Structure formats: structure tokens, C-alpha cells
Amino acid sequence: MKTLAILVLCSLAAICLTSSASAGAQPAGDSPVQGGLFMEKDQASAVVRQTRAAKELTLAQTESLREVCETNMACDEMADAQGIVAAYQAFYGPIPF
């Protein structure tokens, strides 16, 4: 999914750069670098948020997920086959903690 998003953004950037280049000459003081191709690190971090790796679940948290999943027979069987985290997410959505 990330690859598709990056590909689309690169395609749009290429289209914008080629269309502005073919539209006419730029003034001498307006180089592409000053035109916004690059940005400061703090501005870039506001646009692209870094995701952190998920932390390990504690034994109490895992047991809590197991108790919720035990009430649903299909979820309980999936937990035995694929793991409690995959089963909980499939039936109840994202893990709440």
C-alpha cells in the first residue's frame, strides 16, 4: 500500500514538474529548489508521520484478549490456529491498548 502511495506521489510530481517546464521559462531567481521541491525537516515531519513498532503485549493484556475471544466460537478456533492477536483483530478490530 505504501508503494502504491509513493508511486502515485512520484507520478504527480513528475507531471507537475514537466507541465511547469513546458508552460514557459522560469524567472532567473526562481529555481526548482527554491520552489518547494525540498522542505525543512520540521515541516516534512508534519506531513509524513513516523509509525512506531507495536510493543509486545503483556501476559495480562493477552489474557484479556483471550477472554473476550473465548465467548465467540469462531474467534476461539481462529485464535488456536492463527494466534490470539490475529483472531481478535479479525473479529473485534484494533487492539484497544
Swiss-Prot record:
**Residue positions binding Ca(2+) 1:** 63
Source organism, top-level taxon:
Eukaryota
* Sites of 4-carboxyglutamate modification: 63, 67, 70, 77
Q: Which GO terms describe its biological process?
A: bone development; bone mineralization; cellular response to insulin stimulus; glucose homeostasis; negative regulation of bone development; osteoblast differentiation; regulation of bone mineralization; regulation of cellular response to insulin stimulus
Query: A Gene Ontology molecular-function term?
Result: calcium ion binding
Which SMART domains is this protein grouped with? GLA
Q: Propeptide positions in this record? A: 19-52
Q: Where in the cell is it found?
A: Secreted
Example GO CC term: the record gives: extracellular region
Indicate which residues the UniProt annotation says bind Ca(2+) 2.
67, 70
Which residues form each disulfide bond in the chain? 69-75
Where is this protein chiefly located? secreted
Tissue pattern of expression reads: In the branchial arches, BGP is found outside the chondrocyte-containing zone. It is found in some cells in the basal zone of the branchial filaments, near the branchial arches, and within the extracellular matrix in the medial zone. In the vertebra, BGP is found in the mineralized bone matrix.
What processing steps or modifications follow its translation? Gamma-carboxyglutamate residues are formed by vitamin K dependent carboxylation by GGCX. These residues are essential for the binding of calcium.
Q: Which parts of the sequence bind Ca(2+) 3?
A: 70, 76
Family under the similarity heading = Belongs to the osteocalcin/matrix Gla protein family.
Protein's name in the database: Osteocalcin
The lineage is: Eukaryota, Metazoa, Chordata, Craniata, Vertebrata
